From Swiss-Prot:
SUPFAM superfamilies: YbjQ-like (SSF117782). PANTHER family: UPF0145 PROTEIN SCO3412, UPF0145 PROTEIN YBJQ. The lineage of its organism: Bacteria, Bacillati, Actinomycetota, Actinomycetes, Kitasatosporales. This is UPF0145 protein SCO3412. Pfam families: YbjQ_1. InterPro entries: UPF0145_dom_sf, UPF0145_YbjQ-like. Belongs to the UPF0145 family.
């Protein structure tokens, strides 16, 4: 599955546009991570626990996007984006989205 942020795929021709696909996940915050992050924010620096959680969350959202695109018969996703939102002060929502297409080499 080719997943790109561009609106086209060099060297390929779009044969069919299958529509929007997305992968969504919401992760709750771990109390220990929140306390550690609060203390770390006082002195500065990377919040490694939160960074790890966000990377895992983004990867899961992307995996779900790819699953949905495959289920619709796509072999590529164009205009791929992430949207990250705080969900009611209890977690983080990550949505990966794009346009599912069938492409062929030119």
């Amino acid at each position: 599955m080719l997943v790109v942020t561009t609106n086209d795929l060099p060297g390929h021709r779009v044969q069919e546009v299958l529509g929007e696909v997305f992968g969504l996940t919401v992760r709750s915050r771990h109390l220990g991570s929140q306390i550690g992050a609060g203390l770390k924010s006082l002195v500065g620096g990377e919040l490694r626990g939160l960074t790890k959680t966000l990377v895992e969350t983004r990867n899961q959202a992307m995996e779900r996007l790819v699953e949905q695109a495959r289920a619709r018969g796509a072999n590529a996703v164009l205009s791929f984006r992430f949207d990250v939102t705080e969900a009611a002060d209890v977690g983080t929502e990550v949505c990966a989205y794009g346009t599912a297409v069938v492409v062929a080499r030119e």
